[in-house]
Amino acid sequence: ADYILQSRGIIIDFTNKSVINSSLHGCLNIEQFYDKILNWNSIVIEECLDGTLINLYYHDKWKLSTKFSIDTEESKFKSHKTFKELFNEINSIDFDILDKSYTYSFLLQHTEIRNVSLVNVNKLYHLESTNNITGEKVEITIPNIEKPKLLKYRDIINILNVNNLSELIIKTNNLPWTNPGYILYSEDRKYRSKIENPNFIKVLNLVKDQSNLKFLILESLYKKCNIKDLLKYYPEYSTKAVEVNTDFNNYAIKLHKLYIKCKVNNVFVDLEKNFKKTICDVHNLFKDERKKNNQSFKITYNHVCNILRNYDTAYLYSIIYPK
């Protein structure tokens, strides 16, 4: 339903019963979009940019929201800085020229919160503006803030040189992995859809929905076993990958030594909480092997590592990095 798409990201002042923040409408899949916009010539195409959606709105003062947070003063992702701090580092907007009844939607690209596309320069893009009272999209230019490139508009602009959806999909599938694809709009910007680049999605899936870099690398190293792919696209993670691998090995070494001391030499040790279960799991392996009449079986460092690798990532992370 249209009202569901239009409700995406809105913030309501219940006291005054008014919308104080709007956002981009939700995306339709391409079939739904084509049901709404039957004429190819009525479709507007823009470049799709990779970054963080930031909405600027006024409620007693100018405030910022993201897709998942109404308060960027506390919200973070990947960086130790809040979204507001990252925004303010590159903000050059003259707030005096802005309409307090509008929401201004921006895309933030910052080296500290890189998603997939390479970020060499921290930058803001003005995506669109919305009248919070009427819900209409408003055509506004904000000085010194770029907009995404317009690639197709009626028969006036056709930078991509595409004449139908099939041609656009073929072009999208051949884009480099750094390019997300293309955004399609109706002329009134009421409806939008996206043609996604599969090469971009492949890289996105390596890091999707994970802001904890240590967790991401731990999973990549020992569960997904795709660390080479991860570092191919994110070479800046190399130092952290070495650190996480060292932390894993140090934990395994300590666990093996504790096992020898506790279970082989029968020395009492007041175990730290993050070693109690793992010691039991190691000893259970020993007992299982002995039950098979494998009387020469001994627990080695490699056995310990294999046990750790079989834990799910969340538990493995919790014992290597206890709070």
Q: Each predicted region: which residue ranges?
A:
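Core nucleotide-handling region used for phosphoryl-transfer chemistry
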Residues: 1-323
